[in-house]
Every structure is written in C-alpha cells, then in structure tokens.
C-alpha cells in the first residue's frame, strides 16, 4: 500500500477490529486496517473479506489492508486499537515509535491490564506519555451484527473534548450506528471489564439449568457490583445504567454470541476450565478479567460476592453449582446498601 491519508487506522484484524473498520469505511471514510500476521493481511486483501471471522461481509472499497505497521500509522493521526486486554500495553509500546506527532489514540478493548488490574487509561499513559489524547468506545456490540450493518449503539468517552467530538462525528451513522458521548472516562472503561465476569456467571447459571429467574438476578446484582466498584474508583454511577454498563451487561449475559457466556455455560455443564476455553477457540476475556476485577475490588475494599464465586470456580476448582449455592446461602441483606 502506498502512503495514504486515511480518516482512521485500526490496529487489530480480529472480528471486532474488522467489524469496526468495515463500519467506518461504510460511513464513507478511508480506513487502514493493520494486523500482526502479514499472511492473514495478504489473504484478506486477496479475498476482500475476513474469511477467518466475518466470511460473509465484503470489504468496502475504502477499507485498505496494511501489514507494515509504520505505513499503517503514517496514514492517519487517529488510531483505533482493538486487541485483547492482556496484550494492550505491549501493542501500544510497539506503536509508539511510529505514531505521528499529532496522533490521537482510541481503543475498543474491554478489560483491565493482566496481573495488575489497572485501568487501560493508566496502561496507555505509561506506554505513550501524557500528551497524546485518549478515548475509549464501549457498549453492546457483537462483531457479526455490527459488520452486517444491523442497528447498534455504543458509548464514547475521552480525555479531550475535541477528540470526543471528532470521533462521534467519524463513527456515528444515522442508518445503523449510534454513538453517545459520555464524560465518564473511568466508568466507560470499567463497565466492559466487569460485564465479562458477570456474563460467565450468567452462563454458568444457565448451564446448570437454573432458569431465567436466576439469570436475571445475577444480571441485576452484577450491575450492583459493577456500580459499587465504579463508584469506588471515581466513576459516575449513572454511567452503569447506560450503554457501557447495563447495555453491554444484558447483551453479554443473554446471547450465545458472547464467548464469555458460552464459556460459563460449559462450566455449568461440568466441563473443566481448559476444556471450555479450548472449545471456544478464541480469547475469553472474562477469564483473565475475573482475577483482575477481584484484585481491584480488594484493593479498594469493595465487596463483590458474585465475582468472588466466579473466581473460585475459575482458579480454585470450585464446582459451579457449589458456587451458586454459596451465593444463595449468604446471610440476608438489604438490597440497596449491601453486596
């Protein structure tokens, strides 16, 4: 690819990165999509689709493929990072030497930093410094539906008001893709991490066969845990009633397109953690997120009993049914003021 002036460079050619790149290109923008595997990028260029993840969706003419990172980043000041959370910091450090002087970074990655449990904003600042404007997009989005042009809505938050306005204009499409701005940078990030954990729990409940009542209770109390942790970190509690909180939580807990939910279902049916992960065949973000969210909650003194029981299943070999019964057997609580 010769050097071009693109509206956005997307880093990450998995299902979600590809879907976002397709959406941007459909909006009439020139978009460069970069992936870490040159052979995959060459195949996508030949096929003009992502056969591995979205085989039925043809690329718009304005979606350009690039295997050379320096050229991809030279094409646009605005860079959308869509990679798993456990490699987020490594990818940003890889990008930094090639970023334009006027670069701005937005990510659609959902989760916390592996091992440390830090918010991705802290990872980004450490990797990139203080000067680069940052933003995050999050909300109820399945890649296949987004790529198919089905109606979707997300939330957008940024450290920079102009960047937020520019991104909203770039992403928003009145026909299918609605983008809500939100000033709560912490809350929009956190919702996407916690919902992954609760979705595993909802899946486990369904895998056991507990039914719709139990699933709904888990979603509702999971939202309480999300809001409580967010408040401790300085987020606006109302954020968690929006797209990046309740919206993403309901979607991920109730639809089998969710890898986290399917992973939980298999655990509820008695499969082991490794067997369930192997069966999914893609990254199950909630597996790592559970450890990270619980560590963050403990650091801030926030009680999260659902997250604790999911952790026990994933990392301490507790049976999923026993974990559910542990939650049911807790002492009576006041709904509004207790975990």
From Swiss-Prot:
GO terms for cellular component: cytosol. The keyword NAD applies. NADPH binds at residues 15-16, 36, 110, 143, 259, 283, 285. Keywords: Cytoplasm, Lipid biosynthesis, Lipid metabolism, NAD, NADP, Nucleotide-binding, Oxidoreductase, Phospholipid biosynthesis, Phospholipid metabolism. Belongs to the NAD-dependent glycerol-3-phosphate dehydrogenase family. Catalyzes the reduction of the glycolytic intermediate dihydroxyacetone phosphate (DHAP) to sn-glycerol 3-phosphate (G3P), the key precursor for phospholipid synthesis. This is Glycerol-3-phosphate dehydrogenase [NAD(P)+]. The lineage of its organism: Bacteria, Pseudomonadati, Pseudomonadota, Gammaproteobacteria, Enterobacterales.
């Amino acid at each position: 690819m010769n050097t071009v002036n693109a509206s956005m460079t997307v880093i990450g050619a998995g299902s979600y990165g590809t879907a976002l790149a397709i959406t941007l290109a459909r909006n009439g923008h020139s978009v460069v999509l970069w992936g870490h595997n040159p052979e995959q990028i060459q195949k996508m260029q030949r096929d003009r689709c992502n056969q591995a993840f979205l085989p039925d969706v043809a690329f718009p003419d304005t979606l350009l493929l690039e295997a050379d990172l320096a050229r991809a980043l030279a094409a646009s000041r605005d860079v959308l990072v869509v990679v798993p959370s456990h490699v987020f910091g490594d990818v940003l450090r890889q990008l930094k030497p090639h970023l334009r002087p006027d670069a701005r970074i937005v990510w659609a990655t959902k989760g916390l930093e592996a091992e440390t449990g830090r918010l991705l904003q802290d990872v980004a600042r450490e990797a990139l410094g203080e000067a680069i404007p940052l933003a995050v997009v999050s909300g109820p989005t399945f890649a296949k539906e987004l790529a198919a042009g089905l109606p979707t809505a997300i939330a957008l938050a940024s450290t920079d008001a102009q960047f937020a306005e520019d991104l909203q204009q770039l992403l928003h499409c009145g026909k299918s893709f609605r983008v809500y701005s939100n000033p709560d940078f912490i809350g929009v990030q956190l919702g996407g991490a916690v919902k992954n954990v609760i979705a595993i729990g909802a899946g486990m409940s369904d895998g056991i066969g507990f039914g719709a009542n139990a699933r709904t209770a888990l979603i509702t109390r999971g939202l309480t845990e999300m809001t409580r942790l967010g408040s401790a970190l300085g987020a606006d509690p109302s954020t968690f009633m929006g797209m990046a909180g309740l919206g993403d939580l309901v979607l991920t807990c109730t639809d089998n397109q969710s890898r986290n939910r399917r992973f939980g279902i298999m655990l509820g049916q008695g499969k082991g953690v490794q067997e369930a992960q192997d069966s999914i065949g893609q990254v199950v973000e909630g597996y790592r997120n559970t450890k990270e969210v619980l560590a963050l909650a403990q650091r801030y003194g926030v009680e999260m009993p659902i997250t604790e029981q999911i952790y026990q299943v994933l990392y301490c070999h507790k049976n999923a049914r026993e974990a559910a019964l542990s939650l049911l057997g807790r002492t009576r609580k006041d709904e509004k003021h207790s975990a």
